[in-house]
């Protein structure tokens, strides 16, 4: 079977599919949440393939004009007699997204259908933080969330530009961080919005700088202040200890 697949791959590119055997796809695009499971399905008419022993099915992931057998998908062979080639992918990951070719072989005849998997992770949990910037009268607002695909961040009704960046997590998700620095105003809230354009999904968080003020941004003590202060404290402690011993 492993030797047969490369030959079939070449045949799929060079020759039209025989009309004697037809594969259909009840669903061509699958949108799946990270961590959930999915079953990719392509169907065929059992009346066109009378010998059960002659039915073979495989799922190949298409990347860079090449196709490789999917190691993440498991064929549910008990569904073949029902005219279904069902491939189960558990605990979907970001790397499972892409295009697949569902190939069904019936004796000397074969056909295939392309299926697409779109993986998403909603930016539902938005962590917010407020820090007071000493000596400026300004606050630093931060919104951070993880998701997939990459989202755009905007701040509603704010003219000050925000500093937005992202990194990839080991799971392949995007960790997006947006930082805004400005002077707070009484009775004014700020809203950061994460727009996932690929999935047409919008999530947001509201920040009230005055009601949820966190501790100030810690100042770094200069060495020329820190060292003398420690020295004086040690001298004072030594004097106290010596006087107690004399008593």
Swiss-Prot record:
Involved in the costimulatory signal essential for T-cell proliferation and IFNG production in a PDCD1-independent manner. Interaction with PDCD1 inhibits T-cell proliferation by blocking cell cycle progression and cytokine production. The gene is Pdcd1lg2. It comes from the Eukaryota. This is Programmed cell death 1 ligand 2. Changing residue 72 to S: No effect on PDCD1 binding. It comes from Mus musculus (Mouse). Changing residue 116 to Y: No effect on PDCD1 binding. Changing residue 71 to S: Significantly reduces the binding to PDCD1. Belongs to the immunoglobulin superfamily. BTN/MOG family. One of its GO terms (cellular component) is plasma membrane. One of its GO terms (biological process) is negative regulation of type II interferon production. Its main location: membrane.
């Amino acid at each position: 079977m492993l030797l047969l697949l490369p030959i079939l791959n070449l045949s799929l590119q060079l020759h039209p599919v025989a009309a004697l055997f037809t594969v259909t796809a009840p669903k061509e695009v699958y949108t799946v949440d990270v961590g959930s499971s999915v079953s990719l399905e392509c169907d065929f008419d059992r009346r066109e393939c009378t010998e059960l022993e002659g039915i073979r099915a495989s799922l190949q992931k298409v990347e860079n004009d090449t196709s490789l057998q999917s190691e993440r998908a498991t064929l549910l062979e008990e569904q073949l007699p029902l005219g279904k080639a069902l491939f189960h992918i558990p605990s979907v990951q970001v790397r499972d997204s892409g295009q697949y070719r569902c190939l069904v072989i019936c004796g000397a005849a074969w056909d295939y259908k392309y299926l697409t998997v779109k993986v998403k992770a909603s930016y539902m949990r938005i962590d917010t933080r407020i820090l007071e910037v000493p000596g400026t009268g300004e606050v630093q607002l931060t919104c951070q969330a993880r998701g997939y695909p990459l989202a755009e961040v905007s701040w509603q009704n704010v003219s000050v530009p925000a500093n937005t960046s992202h990194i990839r997590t080991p799971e392949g998700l995007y960790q997006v961080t947006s930082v805004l620095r400005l002077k707070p105003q009484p009775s004014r809230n700020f809203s950061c919005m994460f727009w996932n354009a690929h999935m047409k999904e919008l999530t947001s968080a509201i920040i009230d700088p005055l009601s949820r003020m966190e501790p100030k941004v810690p100042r770094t003590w200069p060495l020329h202040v820190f060292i003398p202060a420690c020295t004086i404290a040690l001298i004072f402690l030594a004097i106290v200890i010596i006087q107690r011993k004399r008593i």
